[in-house]
């Protein structure tokens, strides 16, 4: 059985995430997803959605056999425990495939690192674009939203 591991923040799930996970699943028999801990997200703003909720949503996705939270202190710890045959990286993930493979070999793992080049093309295939869209809509309709939330005792 070929075990594939994919990692990511998965803050606001969108079609790009789904495509990445579908492509990762095609690489093997079992797909385990490591969801980044909030404190370990450094290459972009902190996630909006709490980590426990992100892992729950990811675990419910069709291509995913299991989703777990990453380790707070050592990003390699869950990988060492899972011993994957393949690590799937998204087209835009900030890892160098060769350096990652070298690091895994130093740790005794013979894991292949595969860059998924497939990319879903859609207007909101980015959590950042979705957040920007929400901010823009809220700004343009601020009074309407304030009245809505006040009428429900939420402000």
UniProtKB/Swiss-Prot annotation:
The residues that hold ATP are 9-10, 14-17, 92
Q: Recorded E.C. number(s)?
A: 2.7.7.2
Spell out the Pfam families in the cross-references: CTP_transf_like
Domain of life, per lineage: Archaea
Looking up InterPro entries in the UniProt record yields: Archaeal_FAD_synthase (IPR050385), Cyt_trans-like (IPR004821), FAD_synth_RibL (IPR024902), Rossmann-like_a/b/a_fold (IPR014729)
Task: Give the EC class as a word.
Answer: transferase
| CDD domains in UniProt | cytidylyltransferase
Co-factor requirement: a divalent metal cation
**Residues that span the membrane, as ranges:** none
Q: Which reactions is this enzyme annotated as catalysing?
A: FMN + ATP + H(+) = FAD + diphosphate
Output the Gene Ontology terms for molecular function: ATP binding; FMN adenylyltransferase activity
GO BP terms in the entry: FAD biosynthetic process; FMN metabolic process
Which keywords, in A-to-Z order, does the entry hold? Answer: ATP-binding, FAD, Flavoprotein, FMN, Nucleotide-binding, Nucleotidyltransferase, Transferase
Pathway note: Cofactor biosynthesis; FAD biosynthesis; FAD from FMN: step 1/1
Is ATP-binding set as a keyword in this record? yes
Query: Which family does the similarity line name?
Result: Belongs to the archaeal FAD synthase family.
Its annotated function is as follows: Catalyzes the transfer of the AMP portion of ATP to flavin mononucleotide (FMN) to produce flavin adenine dinucleotide (FAD) coenzyme.
The record's subunit annotation is:
Homodimer.
UniProt name for this protein: FAD synthase
């Amino acid at each position: 059985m070929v075990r594939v591991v994919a990692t990511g923040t998965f803050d606001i799930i969108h079609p790009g995430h789904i495509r990445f996970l579908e492509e990762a699943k095609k690489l093997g028999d079992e797909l385990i997803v490591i969801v980044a801990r909030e404190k370990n997200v450094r290459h972009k703003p902190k996630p909006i959605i709490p980590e426990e909720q992100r892992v729950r949503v990811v675990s419910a996705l069709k291509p995913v056999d299991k989703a777990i939270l990453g380790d707070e202190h050592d990003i390699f710890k869950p990988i060492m425990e899972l011993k994957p045959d393949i690590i799937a990286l998204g087209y835009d993930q900030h890892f160098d495939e060769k350096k990652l493979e070298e690091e895994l070999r130093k740790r005794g793992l013979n894991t292949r690192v595969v860059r998924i080049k497939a990319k879903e093309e859609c207007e909101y295939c980015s959590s950042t674009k979705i957040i920007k869209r929400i901010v823009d809509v809220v700004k343009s309709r601020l009074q309407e939203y304030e009245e809505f939330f006040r009428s429900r005792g939420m402000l």
